[in-house]
Curated annotation (Swiss-Prot):
Keyword Transmembrane helix tagged: no
Gene name of this polypeptide: lhx1a
UniProt entry tagged with the keyword Magnesium: no
Protein name, as recorded: LIM/homeobox protein Lhx1
InterPro entries for this protein: HD, Homeobox_CS, Homeodomain-like_sf, Lhx1/5_LIM1, Lhx1/5_LIM2, LIM_Homeobox_TF, Znf_LIM
Cellular location(s): Nucleus
Region called Disordered, residue ranges: 158-184, 296-373
Residue span, LIM zinc-binding domain: 4-54, 63-117
Molecular function GO terms recorded: DNA-binding transcription factor activity; DNA-binding transcription factor activity, RNA polymerase II-specific; RNA polymerase II transcription regulatory region sequence-specific DNA binding; zinc ion binding
CDD domains: homeodomain (cd00086), LIM1_Lhx1_Lhx5 (cd09367), LIM2_Lhx1_Lhx5 (cd09375)
Amino acid sequence: MVHCAGCERPILDRFLLNVLDRAWHIKCVQCCECKCNLTEKCFSREGKLYCKNDFFRRFGTKCAGCAQGISPNDLVRRARSKVFHLNCFTCMMCNKQLSTGEELYIIDENKFVCKDDYLSNTNGKDSNLLSVTACSDPSLSPDSQDQLQDDVKDAEIANLSDKETGNNENDDQNLGGKRRGPRTTIKAKQLETLKAAFAATPKPTRHIREQLAQETGLNMRVIQVWFQNRRSKERRMKQLSALGARRHAFFRSPRRMRTLVDRLEPGELIPNGPFSYYGDYQSEYYGPGGNYDFFPQGPPSSQAQTPVDLPFVPSSGPTGTPLGGMDHPIPGHHPSSEVQRFSDIMSHHPGDSPSPEPGIPGPLHSMSSDVFGPSPSFTSLSLNGSGYSNHLSHPPSEMNEGTVW
């Protein structure tokens, strides 16, 4: 004989119900709260049967306002991690029902003040006010009860402030300003998961963020803010690396002065130099190497073809030892004017311009009479097709006129 699990009497009916692996009379399968018959679906807890509404009202998510259970068919509003009935989500001062998206201020985690009442009472002493944005949810299904506190919409929080910072003396003056919310500590394993997801997709979709929230256990808002900060950091690093590369290229590769030898080919004229000099110049008036007769020490070497090292200065004695460059000019003289004057002398026609006397000691003493005193004597040059007809001789008593043919 089969006995009923509800009334413990034998079942003599033609039909019976099997609930929780036990036999029941049809009339005994009813809600223990409202006593309604359960024909299609029932919920059980601790061996008792409940209808859907009574089960969620008693064991489901509680309203933060009235502390009663929320039915899956009820419309609710959310503020941070709290869920409220529509009728319970009201301002504590004016009892106005707050709508979706309206800015409000939280007092003691479950009491609200609308923005108008808060602004009209800014001299209040409560420093634990939190400014949030209300969010509504049309229904709560049984599958979403466990994730109710973690599932926060992207635009839920407008302005957050840390409740722990309310003990400061200046909180009364900073109530209307923007404050930082509580800081979230991300563990190493969670950080590795987020970095791997960022490497795959720097801008994840909402579906990907939901998966990351389930894997890491973090709030979706925290994940979204982490990705935003990470993208901003990547942009800053790229800008800094590009700027550093430009600075490195500018400071590590300056334009260095190179010698004239590196920039000139053999026989090329020195550009913009004070000496019009040809290495291997040939013409009908000057033979090969004719210009070298001017230098007592022979043609200048390639290592001494800079403007300051050219041994064009005549020697001070019969041995022909050069006096050196123009590194140490005579006090009171102007080397730049001397070089320019020498360039002007050398740039004229050889038959019409006098040449400096090689026997006069001292650098560039034959340049100008107004700088160095009385003008030295000059000698004439007679030119032919094979070169100079004679070398510079000792200074005669007067200047002679040369003939050119």
